[in-house]
Design a protein with these regions (language model features):
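Structural motif
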Residues: 25, 53-54, 90-93, 134, ...
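Short amphipathic alpha-helices in soluble, non-transmembrane regions
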Residues: 147-152, 180-189
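Terminal, non-globular segments
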Residues: 171-180
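Short glycine-/aliphatic-rich beta-strand segments at the starts of folded cytosolic domains
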Residues: 125-143, 169-171
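C-terminal regulatory domains involved in ligand/effector binding and gene-expression control
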Residues: 1-73, 196-210
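Short amphipathic alpha-helix segments
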Residues: 138-156
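Active-site beta-strand/loop microenvironment that shapes enzyme catalytic pockets
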Residues: 79-124
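Conserved short beta-strand edge segments in small beta-sheet-based binding/regulatory domains
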Residues: 157-162, 189-206
Length: 210
């Protein structure tokens, strides 16, 4: 899975369209169980509403939605489309509608549910998830500062250093930069320093406004 975005936090938004109230709730989640639990909570909280439409996306290939009594294709799917267009996953969104007595039509419903989902996403903000690599680097004392400088120059950090006959560094950096770091270390040490990637994991970045 390539880099992607997740909600920075939960949010709640509301607007009125032709006397119908649309209340949007968004929550970052990591599993379908968490998503379903949140949907159930919202349905319980807004038990007296006409509709509690929902969608969720988990990872790169798990997505579900529900129209909860609205005409097919006018609620859950348009909500889902909002997050897909923004490359956002690990999210559940529930839009509650209190009917105001005026029919909105299929087009009006689609626009209203899309707006509610997007409003909730804008309110939450997003975080860029980037694949990072963790690596070990055995480093002679004489080259420590230069090696640390190369790691930093490529957007990485030195997480720990064990001192013995040489210095064994544990570093983290964007996975896409590991090849460049390996090349720089080879040049720096005439092939004497070998970088070993020990793990990879996605990490969130700072909040980004939509």
């Amino acid at each position: 899975m390539s880099d992607f975005r997740v909600p920075f936090g939960p949010s709640e938004t509301e607007f009125t369209e032709k006397r119908s109230r649309f209340i949007g709730h968004l929550l970052p989640v990591e599993t379908e169980e968490q998503a379903r639990e949140f949907i159930a909570q919202m349905k319980k909280k807004y038990y007296d509403a006409r509709h509690n439409c929902w969608c969720y996306l988990i990872g790169g290939d798990t997505m579900r939605y529900g129209d909860d009594g609205e005409p097919q294709g006018t609620a859950g799917q348009p909500m889902l489309n909002v997050f897909q267009r923004e490359n956002v996953t690990n999210v559940v969104c529930v839009v509650t509608r209190y009917f105001g007595g005026i029919l909105l039509g299929a087009g009006g419903l689609t626009r209203a549910y899309s707006k509610s989902a997007r409003d909730a996403l804008v309110a939450a903000g997003v975080s860029e998830m980037r694949l990072w690599a963790m690596a070990d680097i055995p480093c002679p004392y004489a080259l420590f500062e230069r090696v640390r400088g190369e790691v930093t120059a490529l957007g990485g950090t030195v997480d720990s250093a064990d001192y013995g006959a040489d210095i064994r560094l544990t570093v983290s950096l964007p996975a896409e930069n590991t090849a460049a770091l390996r090349e720089r270390l080879t040049e720096l040490s005439a092939g004497g320093i070998a970088l070993t990637v020990t793990a990879e994991a996605y990490r969130p970045g700072p909040k980004v406004e939509i």
